[in-house]
Amino acid sequence: MASSFSRWLVDPKKNPLAAIHMKTLSSRLRNYGLRHDDLYDPMYDLDVKEALNRLPREIVDARNQRLLRAMDLSMKHQYLPEDLQAMQTPFRNYLQEMLALVKRESAEREALGALPLYQRTLP
């Protein structure tokens, strides 16, 4: 019951509030030329950092360029020009598959009782 409700809650095809949220998020990401996967912070989650390290260099460079452009536009209190906003694809994922693979590998290592490949320590 709870899982079907939660699936309904986040599905924009079934829930009109989720559709409104997705449309709003899409327009805000288009304003700065970002993709949804650009919002993941590699300093917060080490799995994201590992997934970014495994991606091809061109994809990571494009991500960094989008983030730099978004920061520059934000500091100038501007948005992308309308013609560039129309070309943006905010929900084209490039990180999800690799992130799922990294999370599966870390869950498998944990299930086998092995030490994690990477861990954060306090200085």
Curated annotation (Swiss-Prot):
<keyword id="KW-0472">Membrane</keyword>
<dbReference type="InterPro" id="IPR003197">
    <property type="entry name" value="QCR7"/>
</dbReference>
<dbReference type="GO" id="GO:0005743">
    <property type="term" value="C:mitochondrial inner membrane"/>
</dbReference>
<keyword id="KW-0249">Electron transport</keyword>
<keyword id="KW-0813">Transport</keyword>
<comment type="similarity">
    <text>Belongs to the UQCRB/QCR7 family.</text>
</comment>
<dbReference type="GO" id="GO:0045275">
    <property type="term" value="C:respiratory chain complex III"/>
</dbReference>
<protein>
    <recommendedName>
        <fullName>Cytochrome b-c1 complex subunit 7</fullName>
    </recommendedName>
</protein>
<dbReference type="Pfam" id="PF02271">
    <property type="entry name" value="UCR_14kD"/>
</dbReference>
<comment type="subunit">
    <text>Component of the ubiquinol-cytochrome c oxidoreductase (cytochrome b-c1 complex, complex III, CIII), a multisubunit enzyme composed of 3 respiratory subunits cytochrome b, cytochrome c1 and Rieske protein, 2 core protein subunits, and additional low-molecular weight protein subunits. The complex exists as an obligatory dimer and forms supercomplexes (SCs) in the inner mitochondrial membrane with cytochrome c oxidase (complex IV, CIV).</text>
</comment>
<dbReference type="GO" id="GO:0006122">
    <property type="term" value="P:mitochondrial electron transport, ubiquinol to cytochrome c"/>
</dbReference>
<keyword id="KW-0679">Respiratory chain</keyword>
<dbReference type="InterPro" id="IPR036544">
    <property type="entry name" value="QCR7_sf"/>
</dbReference>
<comment type="function">
    <text>Component of the ubiquinol-cytochrome c oxidoreductase, a multisubunit transmembrane complex that is part of the mitochondrial electron transport chain which drives oxidative phosphorylation.</text>
</comment>
<keyword id="KW-0999">Mitochondrion inner membrane</keyword>
<keyword id="KW-0496">Mitochondrion</keyword>
